Regions:
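Glycine/Thr-rich phosphate-binding loops that ligate phosphate moieties of nucleotide
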Residues: 1-156
Length: 156
């Protein structure tokens, strides 16, 4: 469970803590790094589940931010979530661009949304691989179970 400063969507738990589960002598720094990246993917997929439960089913989701620069990680996230994930030109500055676009919307309330906020050019679409998705599914369930079982210990 990769949590270092609390958990946000969908758990909203500022007391959540991170743990590594199932370590053996065979695990080294590479496996720990991969576990952190997978944990982020499981948490992202949990957030996507909430969106889907609200009746919103996007065809694809655009990844933004510095971490999204890694095509390898983007593919891992698609494989974990089972969702197509897109990377667009300028995605590494997406958070700042998103904030600027929200400011534009606040200033131009009557503007046509699609004209004010055009979609950035698609660089790469990451479609989930069915075999890897099936491999991640039980790990994701373990992630959920560990989080739930550790909840009573996280607030202390």
């Amino acid at each position: 469970v990769r949590i270092l400063s609390g958990e946000r969507t969908p758990h909203n738990n500022p007391h959540a803590k991170g743990v590594f589960f199932g370590l053996t002598h065979q695990h080294g720094p590479a496996e720990l790094a991969r576990a952190v990246l997978e944990g982020v993917g499981y948490a992202l997929a949990d957030g996507m589940d909430v969106v889907h439960a609200c009746g919103v089913t996007p065809e694809s989701i655009t990844l933004i931010g510095g971490g999204a620069r890694s095509a390898w990680w983007r593919q891992m996230l698609a494989d974990i979530s089972g969702q197509q994930l897109d990377y667009r030109t300028g995605g590494d500055v997406g958070p700042a661009l998103g904030a600027a676009r929200l400011a534009q919307l606040a200033q131009h309330k009557e503007a046509v949304f699609s004209e004010l906020l055009p979609q950035l050019p698609l660089e790469q679409a990451h479609r989930p691989d069915a075999e890897r998705f099936a491999r991640y599914a039980p790990r994701r369930e373990t992630f959920r179970q560990i989080y739930q079982q550790l909840l009573p210990l996280m607030s202390s």
